[in-house]
């Protein structure tokens, strides 16, 4: 995907080959090996880190970044949540009630849907918001964590119920919502992720209104796209007290322009060099800029060999 330093064919002696490499700047150097055996192709790769603790984001942070999102959330909160909850009796356990829920986000009729799991025993509980990776799918809810004594809310981001048959979501992924992460990315307020980020924050509003929530401990977690949303939510809502971001996506979009790995969805690698407006807009949706606003403890993970959410971008 990114600049190749050396590419060559080799013939192994005694089944071994030793390679040497170095870097002059902080980053990750990857070795990818392809072997052709008969009519099959085998691939393997290994990635080495060079002073990764010295990596700094390339993306620029708009001067009004935080102010912009504070105002957008204030505007969204003028729309009442109007929550709806339906008990899913077939999913309930001896200790947990499971609900299909929805609530309004940024305008009348625009809803987030999810699966809420609440311990049956009377009391006040901590809460965990689970935000999704990229794609369109149904959700079962995090019953396991609820059985350990926490409220859990697992949300979808596309404004559709999350308890339909898989074929329903497949049709959307292959049709109207195909490539949704690119929609209106040159429009600051109509970019697809605007509603998504606001929706994740309204999910926190929803949790905080639950009578069973203890008002003290509220976490958010997810992987890839969900890792990004975890950082974004924790950065913008002070009621979030901790987060866990698993290989977060949407990081350091501008890195591509400096020939450095950027995060999924690799806007400028796959979809062409940006015009001035697009570059301006995506800075407001860059996980790296949200991370600058974090003030609560978090747990991160990433994979050196990950070429979807490269570690350089995190």
PLM regions: where:
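Alpha/beta-hydrolase fold nucleophile elbow
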Residues: 213-223
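Short beta-strand-to-loop junctions in surface cap/lid or active-site-entrance loops
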Residues: 106, 113-124, 132-137, 143-146
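Cap/lid segment of the alpha/beta-hydrolase catalytic domain
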Residues: 137-198, 255-262
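Low-complexity, Pro/Ser/Thr- and charge-rich linker/hinge segments at domain boundaries
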Residues: 50-84
């Amino acid at each position: 995907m990114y600049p190749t330093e050396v590419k060559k064919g080799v013939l192994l002696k005694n089944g071994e080959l030793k390679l040497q490499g170095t870097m002059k700047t902080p980053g990750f150097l990857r070795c990818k090996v392809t072997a052709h055996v008969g009519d099959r192709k085998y691939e393997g790769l290994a990635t080495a880190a060079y002073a990764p603790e010295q990596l700094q984001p390339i993306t620029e942070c708009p001067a009004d970044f935080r102010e912009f999102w504070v105002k957008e959330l204030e505007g969204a909160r003028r729309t009442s949540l109007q929550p709806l909850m339906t008990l899913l009796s077939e999913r309930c356990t001896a200790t947990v009630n499971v609900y299909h829920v929805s609530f309004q986000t940024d305008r009348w009729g625009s809803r987030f849907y999810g699966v809420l799991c609440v311990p049956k025993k009377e009391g006040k509980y901590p809460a965990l918001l689970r935000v999704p990776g990229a794609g369109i799918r149904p959700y079962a809810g995090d019953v396991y964590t609820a059985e350990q004594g926490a409220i859990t809310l697992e949300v979808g981001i596309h404004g559709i119920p999350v308890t339909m048959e898989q074929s329903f979501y497949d049709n959307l992924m292959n049709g109207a919502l195909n490539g949704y992460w690119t929609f209106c990315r040159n429009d600051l307020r109509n970019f697809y992720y605007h509603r998504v980020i606001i929706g994740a924050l309204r999910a926190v509003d929803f949790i905080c209104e639950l009578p069973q929530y203890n008002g003290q401990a509220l976490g958010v977690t997810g992987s890839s796209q969900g890792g990004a949303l975890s950082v974004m939510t924790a950065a913008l809502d002070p009621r979030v007290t901790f987060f866990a971001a698993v290989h977060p996506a949407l990081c350091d979009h501008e890195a591509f322009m400096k020939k450095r790995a950027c995060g999924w969805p690799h806007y400028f690698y796959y979809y062409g060099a940006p015009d001035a407006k697009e570059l301006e807009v995506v800075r407001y949706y860059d996980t790296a800029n949200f991370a600058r606003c974090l003030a609560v403890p978090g747990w991160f993970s990433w994979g050196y060999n990950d070429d979807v959410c490269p570690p350089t971008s995190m």
